[in-house]
Amino acid sequence: MLTFQHKEICMKKTMKNDSCLTVSRRAAIIRQDAEENYGTLLTLGESMRRAYQVEELIDRMRWDNVDFCLQRTDGTCLSITGTLTEYEHYFGRPYYENPSNRFLPYYDVHCRKWLTCRVAGIVFGSSVKKN
């Protein structure tokens, strides 16, 4: 059963013409991946919040360079500037996000190459601890 907070996240996503099922599916993947690779147990609310934030990050990356942080499996954070603006140029097709995919491709502006990161490793807001 969804709580008020989860319904609110789903309603925001639905207003952007994306289904609540997409966010829920990505939240389940994030929750499972965080436990397997980072040893972190996420609540349903936290995984839903992260899933929604990942969707927003992808939307911003389609149009511009975005600064974000990745948590490595050893706990350190890596600051990255990435984009998806040239995805279609390099790969010959537009980027279609798949909510069941554990990885997010991005073009690292500083390294000047295409890389992937684990969606569960993306760190948002106050939980960022730079080392």
Give the label of every model feature segment.
Residues H6:
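Cationic, low-complexity basic patches in intrinsically disordered or flexible, solvent-exposed regions
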Residues E36-E56, I80-R93:
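Charged, amphipathic alpha-helical segments
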Residues L70-F103, Y107-H110:
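Short, conserved turn/kink motifs that form compact alpha/beta structural patches or helix kinks used as
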Residues N98-N131:
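Short, compact, well-ordered microdomains
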Residues R62-R72:
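A short, Trp-centered hydrophobic/proline-enriched beta-strand micro-motif
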